[in-house]
Amino acid sequence: MRPSLALVFAFLIASPALADPPDIHVDVPNRKGLEVNVVEHDIAPGQSVGWHIHHGTEITYVLSGALNLQIAGGPIRHVVKGDTFEIDRDTPHRATNDGAEPVALLITYLRDKAGPLAIPVPAPSVH
């Protein structure tokens, strides 16, 4: 395992001991222009994250709560604590917390280093 990726995994194992872990940003060795980001994202009850894309792959683990996830072209999927999901590069998606509890997500992105993490997009048309 490459040293920088080993640091990411070591941090993930140790992070529960931290009160408020920082976001992690690590360059991908031998892959210029790519980085790995690991972030914790919370969604309050009644809140949503509108349609958006990432210039990279998103892998998410639901730490707590329940979420309605919609990926363009697919049905709404209900995900709960312990579930994981993957969203391919540049795929529009959105999420809503319709429950009474906050949702906590641990998200890993393998993405282009340049540019914003998330890019808002219009809702996909339904055919």
Which residue stretches match the model-derived regions?
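A short glycine-rich, His/Asp/Glu-containing loop-to-beta-strand
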Residues: 20-50, 108
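Short, conserved beta-strand element in jelly-roll/cupin
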Residues: 55-69
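Positively charged n-region of N-terminal signal peptides that target proteins for export
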Residues: 1-4
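Short acidic-glycine-tyrosine-enriched beta hairpin
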Residues: 28, 43-44, 67, 73-90
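Ligand-binding loop in jelly-roll beta-barrel domains
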Residues: 68, 90-116
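N-terminal signal peptide c-region/cleavage motif recognized by signal peptidases
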Residues: 14-16
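Extracytoplasmic/periplasmic copper-protein system
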Residues: 20, 115-127
